[in-house]
Swiss-Prot record:
This is Developmental and secondary metabolism regulator veA. One of its GO terms (cellular component) is nucleus. Residues 1-24, 39-63, 236-295, 307-367, 384-573 are annotated as: Disordered. Induction: Expressed almost constitutively at an increased level throughout the asexual and sexual developmental processes. Negatively regulates its own expression. Expression is derepressed in light-illuminated conditions. Expression is regulated by laeA. Regulates its own expression, depending on its phosphorylation state. Phosphorylated at Thr-167, Thr-170, Ser-183 and Tyr-254. Thr-167 should be phosphorylated and T170 and S183 should be dephosphorylated to achieve light induction of conidiation. Phosphorylation of Ser-183 and Tyr-254 influence sterigmatocystin production in a light-independent manner. Phosphorylation of Thr-167 and Thr-170 modulates expression of veA. InterPro entries: Velvet, Velvet_dom, Velvet_dom_sf. Component of the heterotrimeric velvet complex composed of laeA, veA and velB; VeA acting as a bridging protein between laeA and velB. Interacts with the light-sensing phytochrome fphA. Interacts with llmF. The gene is veA. Belongs to the velvet family. VeA subfamily.
Length: 573
């Protein structure tokens, strides 16, 4: 039978360790010593109910109890031998839960409630070398159902294997009879009890959280024992949120949602935080571009045009003189084949209008309608600042321009035009009104004024519109071909020749326009069939020259796709 050991020591600090001694049949003294190396500190209540048995909330940290066994002479306790590893017996430790303060039992309190302690309350001994060479009892799965303040009470039980290790004065165990079934004759003897420090069981809302695993738990786990290890702090801060290390994101989100009057005096920096309006009229950009083109009166002073304006290409070798302003003290640098300034300003016959000089700060323009031909740039002369006068156009704008195929903004649209005597008559020939017939673009009186205007198109403004000269009949065509022009220099385009097309000398394959007629060419960038500007450095002769050349033996020769050369009379359209 199990014998009762000495009563447990009083509670307090001395309750963390306890020891007891007994005398064996051989007259030896054996001492048992229990020491709680790791005390429980906190736990979360796992609650009551049908699922409470699966809700494991172990006590943190897990309790660890150390067992040491010593053997000595009954009359001399100074010479003790540690026999923990060589003692032949079985030990286990049983844990019970007790309240911190004992509750007096009433007369009518006969029925105890449901058990508060859950989990595995029994632990076997594990012989380890660290932290000390001893036996250890580990309780990694102890849970408490209700919140409160409790203590653990650990009871040590021993199962003796050798009869000589039995306690002195007890009856010897009967020897088992072979081949006869009988009840087991082994007994468990209670040795001693040790009580832990009080710990608190919290509810789910008040639980502060779990801490990292202690060095003792890590050391025991490294030796193969079942202990749950946590490498980070799992603390829950639900109570007073006073520090900024764990709710920084919440405060930052609150600051971003604050109204503008709490932010600061800088209204431009906090503008994106204001609520947006659903009205389209209130979302207009104050610095956006105007929806209409301002007139010349709104702009006032002339402004230089910062970008290049694409214009229709003209024959590369031919160029026309541009009259220089009268206040210029010296000659102006002009392209090749330019006559002297005196001849440029000489009066011309009434049928030949003068070209207006370019305005101030006119940049060079580059043609974008070359269609594969070499693009040319003509530098504009730098003129001095001259007082200018505003000229109001007298006729509506005609979109069917005989010079350019796409209307582009020029500098003169933002500047007042310069008051030169021949500027109004030049633009009248350049832009016919809507009431004029379409065949007026190829009349002979306009040929001499159109050719210089094509070359000077990239240097002169195009917003001044005046009246057109009178239209001459077709019967006067032969007489007008021999009229001289004093304001136009010699140009390859003005020399008579038997060819229908005027082309530059190129050592490459002929283009599409060289083999096909005027109406067969593709139209790009707003080009019109009645336009007289042709890409690729080619310009078609007027209709009166074609009619005169048709009487001759001129034929058009072209190469077919199979490589055979074919010639036929030129087709007039």
């Amino acid at each position: 039978m199990a014998t009762l050991a000495a009563p447990p020591p009083p509670l307090g600090e001395s309750g963390n360790s306890n020891s007891v001694s007994r005398i064996t049949r051989e007259g030896k003294k054996i001492t048992y010593k229990l020491n709680i190396m790791q005390q429980p500190k906190r736990a979360r209540a796992c609650g009551q109910g049908s699922k409470s048995h699966t809700d494991r909330r172990p006590v943190d940290p897990p309790p660890v109890i150390e067992l040491n066994i010593f053997e000595s002479d009954p009359h001399d306790d100074s010479n003790k031998t540690d026999i923990t590893f060589v003692y032949n017996a079985n030990f286990f430790l049983f844990a019970t839960l007790e309240p911190e303060r004992p509750i007096a039992t009433g007369k009518l309190m006969t029925n105890q409630g449901s058990p508060v302690l859950t989990g595995v309350p029994v632990a076997g001994v594990a012989y380890l070398d660290k932290p000390n060479r001893a036996g250890y009892f580990i309780f990694p799965d102890l849970s408490v159902r209700n919140e409160g303040s409790y203590r653990f009470s650990f009871h040590l039980f021993e199962q003796i294997k050798d009869p000589k290790d039995a306690t002195e004065g007890t009856q010897p165990m009967p020897s088992p009879v072979p081949g006869k079934l009988s009840s087991p004759q082994e007994f468990l003897e209670f040795r001693l009890e040790v009580i832990s420090n009080p710990f608190i069981v919290y509810s789910a809302k008040k639980f502060p959280g779990l801490t990292t695993s202690t060095p003792i738990s890590r050391m025991i786990a490294e030796q193969g024992c079942r202990v749950r290890i946590r490498r980070d702090v799992r603390m829950r801060r639900r109570g007073d949120k006073r520090t900024e290390d764990y709710d920084y994101d919440n405060e930052r989100g609150y600051n971003n949602r604050r109204p503008d009057q709490y932010a600061g005096s800088d209204a431009y920096a906090n503008a994106p935080e204001r609520p947006r309006s659903t009205s389209i009229s209130t979302n207009m950009d104050p610095y956006s571009y105007p929806s209409r083109r301002p007139s010349a009166v709104e702009y006032g002073q002339p402004i230089a045009q910062p970008y290049q304006r694409p214009m229709a290409s003209t024959p590369a070798p031919s160029s026309t003189p541009i009259p220089a302003p009268i206040p210029m003290p010296g000659p102006v640098a002009l392209p090749p084949s330019t006559p002297s300034p005196a001849s440029a300003h000489a009066p011309a016959p009434p049928s030949v209008p003068l070209a207006a000089p370019p305005p101030l700060h006119t940049p060079s323009y580059q043609s974008h309608l070359s269609f594969g031909a070499t693009q040319t740039q003509y530098p504009a002369p730098q003129l001095s600042h001259i007082p200018q006068q505003t000229t109001t156009p007298t006729h509506p704008y005609s979109p069917r321009s005989s010079i350019s195929h796409s209307r582009n903004q020029s500098i003169s649209e933002y500047e007042p035009s310069m008051g030169y005597p021949g500027s109004q008559t030049r633009l009248s020939a350049e832009r016919p009104s809507y009431g004029q017939p379409s065949q007026t673009t190829s009349l002979p009186p306009l040929r001499h004024s159109l050719e210089p205007s094509v070359n000077s198109r990239s240097k002169t403004p195009s917003n001044m519109i005046t009246s057109l000269p009178p239209i001459q009949s077709l019967s006067e065509l032969p007489s007008t071909t021999s009229q001289p022009s004093s304001a136009i220099g010699s140009s390859p385009a003005n020399e008579p020749g038997p060819r229908l097309w005027e082309t530059n000398s190129m050592l490459s394959k002929r283009t599409y326009e060289e083999s096909f007629g005027h109406d067969d060419r593709p139209l790009y960038n707003g080009m019109r069939p009645d336009s007289e500007s042709y890409p690729g450095g080619m310009q078609r002769r007027p209709s009166y020259e074609r009619s005169s050349l048709l009487d001759g033996p001129d034929q058009m020769a072209y190469k077919r796709a199979n490589g055979r050369m074919v010639s036929k009379p030129a087709t007039m359209r």
